[in-house]
């Protein structure tokens, strides 16, 4: 049944909407909730009372713009003002003032914060939802032991368990447990109330003897028993108020506060009706949980699946910011209380503004954004990375799991993830399955549940209405999995169809008439990264995972190109990333240049600033290029300027290049890639990178450091690019070792420390010898480029605690070279092994040389056949000048649907271009190509086509490293590890075997002695190199062997070793 007009259509929600909605919820609700919790503060004599009048709090507009905050390394925040009152109880006078509480960082439209000039984002955390969960385990006798676990809002856990004798226990610690009757008795219930509120009183009465009944005879006795077992205290403790407070703080506050989410879950699971505002665990909850536990023992009720999303909750940015705001108010309360007491003691008349300071709130948020694991620096490698980063969900973090303790069951895909968490997109390594990505249509509800949209099918009218369902609700509906099956042409076919569906976490096949809900979009259950992979249904899930991760590592190219074969989400991803400049109003373009666009509309002139060579935190270049001309009319929503990695408002991460899948002289062995020099000289894969170099000027004990261009310690050619202030000039080309900022640090020098020539100059000519030390900012190795920006950040009152900063930004142009990493969109990655002249590359039958050559063995074993479909369809699209947007899972319409789509396009391209080699019926998709060196055809036809290939951030310029000299580890005396420490390359056991296999004894000896941990041989080598002569051969044991001997001695094992002389092979005993 076809629909008229736009009926039944839906739009994809903004990809940054989840973050932005969470922050708005914090501003609208969270601030007010925490402010209402702020108590009234009195002095010790109860003469003065301070309170916040929270009904009319205000958030002021930011004092600086986002760009200025980034430029000046400031925080883009809003000032919070709250009316406060100070009441004098003696005269009943009230002084009211508006006080400044502090600064709250603001979220921008992209869902990010700017803190100290750095873009940061807060990740959503998945936690176990508070409530009660029933499970069973087998004991050592093979008998099921049923357990009810109560999880509090703070993550604390208490367990109720029933043993094989039907005795019920409350476990208060890992080793201690008490009778279930003690817990409600300690909460204030007597035995009669307990027995009246349970369904199985005879089971509870069966358990206690006379001694046990005495323990629950009163509340005091129950508290003493509870405290004795909980704290493992012996003897006979005495009941007191301090004992109750300690128990309240250590147990009840940590494990019995359910929160509003926990109260709702507890009411639903136990079928009770306790009011929502009662968020603490009550005796009624414990007794109802006991009844359900007894029912489980006798086969009534169902166990809970802890990994089901209905038992999880999202801790969003709103919750995290609200928790930090509450923590800041607690600190503010302590400050106000101390200030009031001090003012009264010193007979000082306080005012509300004198009592309140902004330090607690400001420092709390600064530490949160700087130190909290869920607050991360925004990854801005390309536009896709920015929006994907904000949609991540993590099981890690405070109150969550760790990568080393999480089980496989938690990491695994669960049926409840359907339409909520992507089954493909997750991290690789130790955190696999713990860090996921939300599906493109997923939303986060007010109660922390992840909701997914479905079309609800009415029985009467067969009309569809979109609803957002939580995991708890859609469990009992028949949900049709494949959305495309609903596109049947008439009602008769619809009635006869048998469709796949999901019901109660199981996948079944059922008639159409029994369907309650259906999916709204074929890509509904995928994340953004996975939704950008064409023909994803033909790829192995592991390769799709790699692809979704590698697309986030793609470097924006200098000349971007949108893909020939895509999925249709490229425009939405580019739009929501904020990389492109979009017209907010319709109007006429009256001026445009590289810095701004002036738009005239409705009598107003709007200036739209553009990004110019802005550095991302991954050193990639963020730049916007105008796409409209002067005197042109634009509409609202039209693209005014393309950003990095966008073309025409669509995401463009790579280039469409001509590829061939064939071996070539071993240069594409094991995922190596052979490329043509056209990709280098044509700037096909050329990218710009911007590096930041920073230096600070301090005020030392001998005086302030000085920025100058007069550096007597350095040669003149190193200072050639400095201006009169000692800072490198804009537009200068700098090489390794050049001085970017000249700086002298004062220091004291004694007369005896002067060199003889310095003393001579002072005595004869009277010249004052400089006592300053050269501490210039120099360009490190691999940093050559063009200076594009210099920033001198001067703050008021410069001191040793508030130094001035000078930042120099240098742009580098990087062509693709051997060692760079490239990848496709199907997990097909490789390293450039050789760059061939274009005349030596294999060429097609029309003479066109191939751009890249891949190993054909990388396809069948990895099972990512989607790259073959994309390759062939891309060739047809290039010849026909078409772009394709392919919806995944097209096999639901008919078998071999993808193949039936590609082959007709190749056939049409062959006919239109009069090139029969494009589609040859004997081997469709393949073609015979020729060797560029000899002109001879290869033996077998080869798959050729246009693939969309990306250049990744893993570039050889950032990774290549060589060590001539450097530091050694103190214990092993071996070179340090890592490029940043000027470390060496480890020669392990297998590397030694390889060198032994080639018989290179002298090279092996050098690696294991001179270049490693033979201290004496290293010293002799240095002296011999300076003086000249024959390098002596190492004698004695290396330091690592001596270390082994010492460690064995520490275990009371004496190990003696012997050295064999080369001359007579006699054994000489020598001590280590």
Curated annotation (Swiss-Prot):
Transmembrane helix recorded as keyword: no
EC number: 2.7.7.6
Keyword annotations: Chloroplast, DNA-directed RNA polymerase, Nucleotidyltransferase, Plastid, Transcription, Transferase
InterPro entries hit by this protein: DNA-dir_RNA_pol_bsu_ext_1_sf (IPR042107), DNA-dir_RNA_pol_su2 (IPR015712), DNA-dir_RNAP_su2_dom (IPR007120), DNA-dir_RNAP_su2_hyb_sf (IPR037033), RNA_pol_bsu_bac (IPR010243), RNA_pol_bsu_CS (IPR007121), RNA_pol_Rpb2_2 (IPR007642), RNA_pol_Rpb2_2_sf (IPR037034)
Gene3D superfamilies: 2.40.50.100, 2.40.50.150, 3.90.1100.10, DNA-directed RNA polymerase, beta subunit, external 1 domain, DNA-directed RNA polymerase, subunit 2, domain 6, RNA polymerase alpha subunit dimerisation domain, RNA polymerase Rpb2, domain 2
Swiss-Prot/TrEMBL catalytic activity: RNA(n) + a ribonucleoside 5'-triphosphate = RNA(n+1) + diphosphate
GO BP, sorted A to Z: DNA-templated transcription
UniProt GO molecular function: DNA binding; DNA-directed RNA polymerase activity; ribonucleoside binding
Location of this chain's protein in the cell: Plastid, Chloroplast
Any Pfam family the entry gives: RNA_pol_Rpb2_2
GO cellular component: chloroplast; DNA-directed RNA polymerase complex; mitochondrion
EC class of the enzyme, as a word: transferase
Family per similarity comment: Belongs to the RNA polymerase beta chain family.
PANTHER family referenced in this protein's UniProt entry, alphabetically: DNA-DIRECTED RNA POLYMERASE I SUBUNIT 2 (PTHR20856)
UniProt function note: DNA-dependent RNA polymerase catalyzes the transcription of DNA into RNA using the four ribonucleoside triphosphates as substrates.
Quaternary organization: In plastids the minimal PEP RNA polymerase catalytic core is composed of four subunits: alpha, beta, beta', and beta''. When a (nuclear-encoded) sigma factor is associated with the core the holoenzyme is formed, which can initiate transcription.
Protein name: DNA-directed RNA polymerase subunit beta
The species this protein was found in: Amborella trichopoda
């Amino acid at each position: 049944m076809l629909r008229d007009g736009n009926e039944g259509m839906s739009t994809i929600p903004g990809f940054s909407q989840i973050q932005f909605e969470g922050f708005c919820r914090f501003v609208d609700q969270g601030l007010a909730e925490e402010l209402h919790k702020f108590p009234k503060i009195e002095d010790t004599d109860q003469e003065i009372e301070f309170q916040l009048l929270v009904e009319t709090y205000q958030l002021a507009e930011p004092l600086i713009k986002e760009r200025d905050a980034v430029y000046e390394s400031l925080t883009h925040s809003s000032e919070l003002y709250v009316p406060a009152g100070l009441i004098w109880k003696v005269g009943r006078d009230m002084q009211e003032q508006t006080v400044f509480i502090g600064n709250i960082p603001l979220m921008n439209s992209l869902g990010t914060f700017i803190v100290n000039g750095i873009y940061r984002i807060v990740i959503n955390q998945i936690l176990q939802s508070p409530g009660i969960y029933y499970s069973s385990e087998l004991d050592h006798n093979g008998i099921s032991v049923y357990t009810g676990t109560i999880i509090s809002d703070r993550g604390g856990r208490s367990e109720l368990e029933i043993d094989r004798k039907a005795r019920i226990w409350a476990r208060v610690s890992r080793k201690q447990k008490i009778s279930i009757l003690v817990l409600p008795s300690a909460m204030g219930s007597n035995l009669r109330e307990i027995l009246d509120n349970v369904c199985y009183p005879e089971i509870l009465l069966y358990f206690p003897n006379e001694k046990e009944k005495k323990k629950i005879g009163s509340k005091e006795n129950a508290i003493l028993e509870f405290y004795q077992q909980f704290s493992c205290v012996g003897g006979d403790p005495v009941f007191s108020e301090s004992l109750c407070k300690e128990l309240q703080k250590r147990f009840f506050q940590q494990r019995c506060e359910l929160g509003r989410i926990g109260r709702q879950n507890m009411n639903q699971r136990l079928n009770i009706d306790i009011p929502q505002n009662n968020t603490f665990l009550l005796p009624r909850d414990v007794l109802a949980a006991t009844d359900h536990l007894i029912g489980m023992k006798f086969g009534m009720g169902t166990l809970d699946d802890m990994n089901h999303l209905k038992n999880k909750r999202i801790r969003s940015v709103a919750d995290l910011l609200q928790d930090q705001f509450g923590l800041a108010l607690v600190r503010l309360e302590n400050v106000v209380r101390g200030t009031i007491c001090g003012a009264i003691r010193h007979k000082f008349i306080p005012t509300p503004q004198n009592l309140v300071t902004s330090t607690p709130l400001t420092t709390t948020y600064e530490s949160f954004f700087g130190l909290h694991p869920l607050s991360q620096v925004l990854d801005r490698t390309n536009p896709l990375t920015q929006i994907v980063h904000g949609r991540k969900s993590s099981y890690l973090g405070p109150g969550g799991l760790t990568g080393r303790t999480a089980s496989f069951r938690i990491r695994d895909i669960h049926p409840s993830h359907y339409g909520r968490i992507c089954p493909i997109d997750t991290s690789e390594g130790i955190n696999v399955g713990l860090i996921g990505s939300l599906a493109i249509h997923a939303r986060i509800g007010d109660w922390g549940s992840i909701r997914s949209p479905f079309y609800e099918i009415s029985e009467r009218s067969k009309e569809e209405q979109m609803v957002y369902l939580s995991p708890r609700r859609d469990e009992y509906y028949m949900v049709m999995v494949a959305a495309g099956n609903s596109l049947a042409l008439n009602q008769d076919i619809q009635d006869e169809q048998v469709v796949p569906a999901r019901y109660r976490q199981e996948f079944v096949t059922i008639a159409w008439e029994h369907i309650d809900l259906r999916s709204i979009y074929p890509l509904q259950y995928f994340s953004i990264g996975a939704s950008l992979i064409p023909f994803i249904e033909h790829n192995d899930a592991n390769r799709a995972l790699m692809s979704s991760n590698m697309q986030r590592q793609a470097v924006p190219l200098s000349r971007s190109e949108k893909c020939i074969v895509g999925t249709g989400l490229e425009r939405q991803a580019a739009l929501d990333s904020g990389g492109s400049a979009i017209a907010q109003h319709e109007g006429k373009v009256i001026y445009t240049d590289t810095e701004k666009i002036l738009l005239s509309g409705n009598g107003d002139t709007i200036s739209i600033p553009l990004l110019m060579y802005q550095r991302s935190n991954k050193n990639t270049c963020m730049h916007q290029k105008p796409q409209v001309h002067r005197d042109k009319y634009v509409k609202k929503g039209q693209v005014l300027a393309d950003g990095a990695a966008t073309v025409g408002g669509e995401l463009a991460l790579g280039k469409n290049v001509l590829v061939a899948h064939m071996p070539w002289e071993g240069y594409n062995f094991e995922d190596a890639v052979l490329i043509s020099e056209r990709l280098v000289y044509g700037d096909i894969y050329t990218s710009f990178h911007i590096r930041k170099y920073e230096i600070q000027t301090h005020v030392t004990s001998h005086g302030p450091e000085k920025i100058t261009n007069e550096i007597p310690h350095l040669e003149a050619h190193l200072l050639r690019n400095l201006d009169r202030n000692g800072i490198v000039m804009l537009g200068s080309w700098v090489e390794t070792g050049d001085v970017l900022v000249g700086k002298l640090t004062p220091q004291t020098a004694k007369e005896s420390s002067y060199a003889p020539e310095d003393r001579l100059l002072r005595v004869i000519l009277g010249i004052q010898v400089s006592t300053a030390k050269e501490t210039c900012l120099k360009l490190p190795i691999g940093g050559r480029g063009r200076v594009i920006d210099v920033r001198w950040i001067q703050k008021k009152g410069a001191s040793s605690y508030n130094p001035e900063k000078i930042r120099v930004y240098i742009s580098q142009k990087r062509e693709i070279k051997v060692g760079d990493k490239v990848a496709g969109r199907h997990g097909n990655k490789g390293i450039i092994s050789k760059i061939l002249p274009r005349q030596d590359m294999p060429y097609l039958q029309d003479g066109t040389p191939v751009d890249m050559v891949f190993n054909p063995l990388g396809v069948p074993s990895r099972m990512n056949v989607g790259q073959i479909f994309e390759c062939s369809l891309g060739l047809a699209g290039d010849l026909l000048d078409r772009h394709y947007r392919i919806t995944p899972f097209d096999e639901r319409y008919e078998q071999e649907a993808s193949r039936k789509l590609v082959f007709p396009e190749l056939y049409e391209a062959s006919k239109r271009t009069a090139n029969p080699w494009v589609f040859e019926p004997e081997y469709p998709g393949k073609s015979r190509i020729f060797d560029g060196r000899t002109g001879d055809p290869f033996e077998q036809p080869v798959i050729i086509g246009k693939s969309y290939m990306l250049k990744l951030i893993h570039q050889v310029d950032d990774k290549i490293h060589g060590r001539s000299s450097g530091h050694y580890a103190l214990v092993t005396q071996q070179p340090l590890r890592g490029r940043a420490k000027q470390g060496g390359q480890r020669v392990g056991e297998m590397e030694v075997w390889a060198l032994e296999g080639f018989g290179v004894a002298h090279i092996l000896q050098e690696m294991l002695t001179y270049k490693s941990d033979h201290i004496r041989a290293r010293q002799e080598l240095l002296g011999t190199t300076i003086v000249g002569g024959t390098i002596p051969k190492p004698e004695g044991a290396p330091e690592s062997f001596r270390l082994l001997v010492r460690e064995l001695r520490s275990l009371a094992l004496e190990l003696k070793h012997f050295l064999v002389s080369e001359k007579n092979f006699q054994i000489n005993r020598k001590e280590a």
